[in-house]
């Protein structure tokens, strides 16, 4: 049973996706109740009552829907053989990235694994830049040279192709923040399959030793490639994995719960208490990568059940519509605008100019004098250029 409060009136309504709602100020803001947070070595944790404004609700819904549609477009481009190399989709896990980003301040940093399209979009790249990067276009996020796994943004350090490679990188970024006496946090994202990597334990030891402002975030989607978590981990309570590092479990399919947990964890780090581990319980709809149909180690019925009962976008839409924050007509208009943006981006990904061969020698080093480029066949003196400089030169 859910009670929706509009001004002083109580209107009972029923929805399995919402535990409790209170709405004030003519439905311009609302308070929802999340699933309880599980805690490790913490006396208290985030409040389960989370507040959201209409503006933020629309923003989060639009971002999650955009990522979902963008990933669908990326999958289609791959099937058309327009995407070369690997391609890992984020469909189903949108609330993890959107909720985390919503809790970040301008100076905070993030680093993640190869499932990075959504994070790249949230870090300032347009949908067109992401899709053009996938198809090797000069208008891509990194001029078409990075592909699916290597995209970047302001204070977003990738996109890393090696399992767990971002764990020590995030620790190093947090060390730099503390060294510079900056009140910021580095959020280091990885999957459940990477929690058994030795470098995670090494990183957490150093982070706790020096009380670095780093959040280790495990996006537990249930499968490391094609292996269920219980078949590879002696304990699947990943929020306790840090032992001496405190941890929080959060429903990773609830964008507001994710935002609440990360906000609380950031306050912990900024108070000088050191690192914290967050496990976000989520799910991926696609296979590990586009080469994996995702049906040999789980059933289609399992995937459909999650879509029906736990989908982060549908669940959030039901909440904000029930609360009166948005109308069905507003939802339809958002859907229309997102489709329009995706369609335009797909067209660019097909037609924009491909990255020229001249860019192969750019971005090797920064600001160095002209010299011979090693491992090339032409004995020609080359100036080390950035891709931006090379593109400008080619345009002349």
Curated annotation (Swiss-Prot):
Record has Phosphoprotein as a keyword: yes
Binding positions for pyruvate per the UniProt entry: 88, 114-115, 153, 161, 163, 192-194, 221, 223
Enzyme class: oxidoreductase
Residue positions binding Mg(2+): 192, 221, 223
GO biological process per UniProt: glucose metabolic process; pyruvate decarboxylation to acetyl-CoA; tricarboxylic acid cycle
Parts of the chain that traverse the membrane: none
Listed Pfam families: E1_dh (PF00676)
InterPro entries: DH_E1, PDH_E1_Alpha_Subunit, Pyrv_DH_E1_asu_subgrp-y, THDP-binding
Identification of the protein by name: Pyruvate dehydrogenase E1 component subunit alpha type I, mitochondrial
Source organism per UniProt: Ascaris suum (Pig roundworm)
């Amino acid at each position: 049973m859910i009670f929706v409060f509009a001004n002083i009136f109580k209107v009972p309504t029923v929805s399995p996706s919402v535990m409790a709602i209170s709405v004030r100020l003519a439905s311009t803001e609302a308070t929802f109740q999340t699933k309880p947070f599980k805690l490790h070595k913490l006396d208290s944790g985030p409040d389960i009552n989370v507040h959201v404004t209409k503006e933020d609700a629309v923003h989060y819904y639009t971002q999650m829907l955009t990522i979902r549609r963008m990933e669908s477009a990326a999958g289609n481009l791959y099937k058309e053989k327009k995407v070369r190399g690997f391609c890992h989709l984020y469909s189903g896990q949108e609330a993890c990235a959107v909720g985390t980003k919503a809790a970040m301040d301008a100076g905070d940093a993030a680093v993640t694994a190869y499932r990075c399209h959504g994070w790249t979009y949230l870090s300032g790249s347009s949908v067109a830049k992401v899709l053009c990067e996938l198809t090797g276009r000069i208008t891509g996020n990194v001029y078409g040279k990075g592909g699916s796994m290597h995209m970047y943004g302001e204070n977003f350090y990738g996109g890393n192709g090696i399992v767990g490679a971002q764990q020590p990188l995030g620790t190093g970024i947090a060390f730099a923040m503390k060294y510079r006496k900056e009140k910021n946090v580095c959020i280091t994202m990885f999957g459940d399959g990477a929690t058994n990597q030795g470098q995670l334990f090494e990183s957490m030891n150093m982070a706790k030793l020096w009380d670095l402002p780093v959040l280790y975030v495990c996006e537990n989607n249930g499968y490391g490639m094609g292996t269920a978590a219980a078949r590879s981990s002696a304990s699947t309570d990943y929020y306790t994995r840090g032992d001496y590092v405190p941890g929080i479990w959060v429903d990773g399919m609830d964008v507001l719960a994710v935002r609440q947990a990360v906000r609380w964890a950031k306050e912990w780090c900024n108070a000088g208490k050191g690192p914290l581990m967050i496990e976000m319980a989520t799910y991926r709809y696609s296979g590990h990568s586009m080469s994996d149909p995702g049906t040999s180690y789980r059933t289609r019925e399992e995937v459909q059940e999650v879509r029906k009962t736990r989908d982060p976008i549908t669940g959030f839409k039901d909440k904000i519509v029930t609360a009166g924050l948005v109308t069905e007509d507003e939802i339809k208009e958002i859907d229309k605008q997102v489709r329009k943006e995706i369609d335009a981006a797909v067209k660019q990904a097909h037609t924009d100019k491909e990255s020229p061969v001249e860019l192969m020698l750019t971005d090797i080093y920064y600001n160095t004098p002209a010299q011979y480029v090693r491992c090339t066949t032409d004995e020609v003196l080359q100036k080390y250029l950035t891709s931006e400089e090379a593109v400008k030169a080619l345009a002349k």
